Amino acid sequence: MSNPTSTPRADGFRMPAEWEPHEQTWMVWPERPDNWRNGGKPAQAAFAAVAKAIARFEPVTVCASAGQYENARARLDDGNIRVVEISSDDAWVRDTGPTFVIDDKGDVRGVDWGFNAWGGFEGGLYFPWQRDDQVARKILEIERRARYRTDDFVLEGGSIHVDGEGTLITTEECLLNHNRNPHLSQAEIERTLRDYLAVESIIWLPNGLYNDETDGHVDNFCCYARPGEVLLAWTDDQDDPNYLRCQAALRVLEESRDAKGRKLVVHKMPIPGPLYATQEECDGVDIVEGSQPRDPSIRLAGSYVNFLIVNGGIIAPSFDDPKDAEARAILQRVFPEHEVVMVPGREILLGGGNIHCITQQQPAPRKA
């Protein structure tokens, strides 16, 4: 497997949109007891449900530790799900796995961003994180795909969305946070994104969702549905701390033009809840120095925008919330050619994310 010293853009590669054909989806099996309650068993059931939902549409590969391999293999009893042994620190493969890039000659490669657990020693969620920083490399080794490594640039896959036609959406709250790349200016960060993802236009939303532990990942707040159309988490409640965030994002989106010069169509997606963990749920998480404490008074950053587009399907979270039905209807309207599958997302949310955060699509090779 080669490790090019050039950049994807220089080699003719680009990050494809999520709706472009997939070869498979990657996941990592949860077990960390200081993040997942009750030894991770409820989360494992939730991850298994997500994996099986995706497997209806495309192959799934789940990475499990040596200690959990047999358990994961038994619970993922589906012929379209492969389980491989990979050690990791936690289960957020959107952020620790590779960002795959493709060219028009049938090749697929991967970008291995630096990872510091969403902030390193200035707000990061756990330490150590070196096994998570190795996940992308291990996946690319398994797939025998060339790897572009950015040793001096930290980025999580959940902090970006692309339309496949030259436009990227992100948030200032995350990418400009001093705990990611304090040595780089905004212009230098943009240059890196252009070099490694082959985008032309970058739309900067001010913030992500309120109380998002990742410092406002865009994949929990706003995502592309197709070129020129986005879904935006939304509330009309002026007392909701998300209200001003939604308004500010909408202003930016309405004033922006994408790389093709198009104005954006914005589909508003209701925010569930407000949702909170129960005391019992918090008590089920181990207390370990250096990890994120759980508090039932802190609002959870629940979002229906945190879904995954797969081959012919939309895998989206439900929360046993009155807005679940409305979210499903919006997704079905926005994606009329896809089957919308809602999977319970509360257990994943309790750990700090949702379906998009725990998945990473690998695009299928394609030739022009």
From Swiss-Prot:
Describe which pathway this protein belongs to, using the record's wording.
Amine and polyamine biosynthesis; putrescine biosynthesis via agmatine pathway; N-carbamoylputrescine from agmatine: step 1/1
Q: How does it assemble?
A: Homodimer.
On induction, the UniProt comment says: By agmatine and N-carbamoylputrescine.
Source organism per UniProt:
Pseudomonas aeruginosa (strain ATCC 15692 / DSM 22644 / CIP 104116 / JCM 14847 / LMG 12228 / 1C / PRS 101 / PAO1)
The name this protein goes by in its record: Agmatine deiminase
EC number(s) recorded for this UniProt protein: 3.5.3.12
Q: What phylogenetic lineage does the species belong to?
A: Bacteria, Pseudomonadati, Pseudomonadota, Gammaproteobacteria, Pseudomonadales
What Pfam families does its record include? PAD_porph (PF04371)
Gene that produces this protein? aguA
| Similarity section | Belongs to the agmatine deiminase family.
